[in-house]
A protein has these predicted regions:
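S-adenosyl-L-methionine
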Residues: 1-38
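Core SAM-dependent methyltransferase catalytic element
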Residues: 329, 382-400
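Short glycine-dipeptide loop
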Residues: 38, 257-261, 323, 328-333
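SAM-dependent nucleic-acid methyltransferase catalytic core
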Residues: 125, 130-233, 238-247
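Alpha-helical packing segments of well-folded alpha/beta enzyme cores
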Residues: 24-27, 124, 128, 191, ...
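SAM-dependent methyltransferase catalytic-core segment centered on the flexible catalytic loop
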Residues: 237-323
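Acceptor-substrate binding/catalytic loop of class I
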Residues: 14-18, 108-120, 306-315, 337-352
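Conserved S-adenosyl-L-methionine
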Residues: 24, 31-100, 187, 193-222, ...
Length: 400
């Protein structure tokens, strides 16, 4: 976003698509045209908000997306598949009618819920959750659109500061939102109308599929015609726990309507800072990580916890990339978009480490360029979260 004086201003994410700095449409389209002009089948194994898949789908390419985040799968699925606005509107009315009876609810199993929502708002969401499950909204395209509208309303109806992609209750939000009731029904109806104007005109030109897949533990992820001719993806950042934090409110509301466990999910995001990070990592693997990231051994001595975050990221990404490489066709192309990171005060060239992991899986680098991120920063800057990525590296590989 550029102001009148020509200076770049941080972009506040929109209400309908605020996935944190994962991919932007102009870069997605550039990558498709540059590397996948003759694409037979395209996979984005970390699809996020689906920008890569949407760009490929517009060209009539069969696209497949994976993501561990149920919210990302829901959002991208609605984007790619489209839905019938009239059918969705009927389902929305059924949802409201069933929930408004007030005699049944599906409680949110989370101790923090009363901190984030007023009692009246919380009661309405728990009634809506019961109605959504009873109506099976997750089983149809129109139902998923209604469910996405429910999820999109959650932040708007919470006590959270609306300026940041990550929910927190600032002093300003506490003062401005205290004692006010934010009605989910009104927000859901408006949001569904906005979704219909964008995605209610039919479905993708070609086959478009989105699956919830944990690539670290995946045994046999879905394939297209024996494999994918092209993979284009922006993997999670090294300190990517924000992908969970940013959507923890929505995930708590969706849990039980969509089959997943939020308590377990927070540990499955690549880049997590939670839990026992190095329990499964052997000494041999740690030594390999020290080779991948110069300075990691020094970081381990000065800040073991930060070093553990790096170890866990490299461990998880190593397994994820191996899984990805195994489902690319022998003549396939793989494009990785990744930036640097700042962890514990240490500057890490994450993309260099991932490029090495790709070469270890039999892929050779044949092209690349840098993409400056001047308009993807999000306010406000908060203590402990100043490691904003200023530039990403695009690296294109073919099988060696």
């Amino acid at each position: 976003m550029v102001s009148e004086d020509g200076k770049i201003k941080p972009r506040v994410p929109t209400r309908l698509d605020r996935y944190p700095a994962k991919m932007v449409s102009h870069l997605a389209e550039r990558l498709i045209k540059k590397y996948a002009s003759r694409c037979e089948s395209l996979l984005d194994p970390f699809c996020g908000s689906g920008a890569i898949l949407a760009a490929g789908s517009r060209l009539g390419v069969p696209v497949t997306g994976f993501d561990v985040n149920p919210y990302a799968v829901l959002l991208t699925g609605v984007k790619l598949s489209g839905f019938c606005p009239q059918e969705a509107e009927c389902l929305r009315q059924d949802l409201f009618d069933l929930a408004a009876r007030g005699d049944r609810s599906l409680p949110i199993a989370w101790d923090g819920k009363e901190y984030w929502f007023s009692a009246a708002t919380l009661a309405k969401y728990e009634q809506l959750r019961f109605a959504a499950r009873e109506l099976g909204l997750n089983r149809s395209r129109a139902g998923k659109a209604v469910l996405l509208a429910v999820a999109l309303s959650v932040r708007l109806c919470s006590r959270a500061d609306q300026r940041s992609p990550k929910p927190f209750i600032s002093k300003r939000a506490a003062e401005e939102r205290r004692g006010r009731h934010y009605d989910p029904y009104r927000q859901i109806e408006r949001l569904l109308g906005e979704l219909a104007s964008l995605y209610g005109k039919g479905q993708a030109k070609a086959l478009a599929r989105v699956f919830r897949v944990d690539l670290v533990g995946a045994q046999d992820p879905p394939k297209y015609d024996g494999g994918y001719s092209h993979v284009i993806t922006s993997p999670p950042y090294l300190n990517a726990q924000d992908y969970y934090r940013n959507f923890k409110l929505e995930l708590r509301v969706l849990e039980g309507i969509i089959p997943f466990n939020a308590d377990n999910l927070q540990y499955r995001f690549i880049g997590t800072e939670r839990g026992h990070l190095i329990t499964r990592i052997s000494e041999t693997e740690m030594e390999q990580h020290y080779e991948l990231v110069p300075g990691l051994r020094k970081l381990a001595n000065s800040s073991p916890r930060h070093a553990a975050v790096v170890h866990r990221y490299l461990y998880d990404m190593g397994r994820a990339l191996k899984t990805i490489c195994n489902i690319v066709k022998p003549t396939g192309t793989c494009v990785i978009i990744c930036g640097d990171n700042l962890v514990g005060g240490m500057h890490i060239r994450t993309w260099t480490a991932l490029n090495t992991l790709m070469s270890q899986n039999g892929f050779a680098l044949y092209d690349g360029f840098s993409d400056t991120i001047q308009n993807r920063m999000v306010p406000p800057t908060r203590q402990g979260h100043k490691g904003l990525i200023k530039q990403e590296r695009v690296s294109a590989f073919r099988r060696d």
